[in-house]
A protein has these predicted regions:
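Active-site metal-coordination/substrate-binding segment of hydrolases
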Residues: 81-129
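N-terminal helical capping/dimerization or prosegment-like subdomains
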Residues: 2-94
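Hydrophobic transmembrane alpha-helix bundles
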Residues: 1, 68-72, 101-109
């Protein structure tokens, strides 16, 4: 059986883009001034982790939040595991932006992402059903 991945993505484009935009809109800058027992890197990274795991769970993956330091999700059964390591926190956006650095923009039919947001986009692609 051959799968036309482009056609499958095109069928789901609007929903996929909304999921991606939801993750990209989260300001997940590390904020050591707000670190506590429930927010080891500040509230932003925890919010991004919770959102990411919620997407994975919604799509049928078994998820686990490890004390807000990390999370994982799995699908299927077996003795072998494929691990993909990534992070959802970002460097501070700084100043000088023409637009909100946490609001994705489509320009000329293309999704424009700032460099630090590409990290989140890569994690999101892993969870696509």
């Amino acid at each position: 059986m051959t799968i036309d991945f482009r056609a499958e993505v095109d069928k789901r484009k609007d929903a996929l883009m909304e999921d991606l935009f939801g993750l990209l809109r989260i300001n997940s800058e590390r904020d050591d001034s707000k670190v506590d027992d429930k927010h080891p890197f500040g509230p932003g990274p925890v919010k991004a982790l919770e959102h990411f795991l919620a997407l994975a769970e919604r799509d049928g993956y078994k998820t686990r939040n490890i004390d807000n330091y990390a999370g994982d999700f799995e699908f299927g059964q077996g003795d072998e595991v494929l691990g993909i390591f990534a992070h959802l926190d970002v460097v501070p956006a700084g100043s000088g932006w023409d637009t909100d650095p946490y609001e994705p923009v489509i320009k000329d039919g293309k999704l424009m992402l700032v460099g630090h947001q590409m990290i989140k986009a890569q994690q999101w692609l892993v969870t696509m059903p």
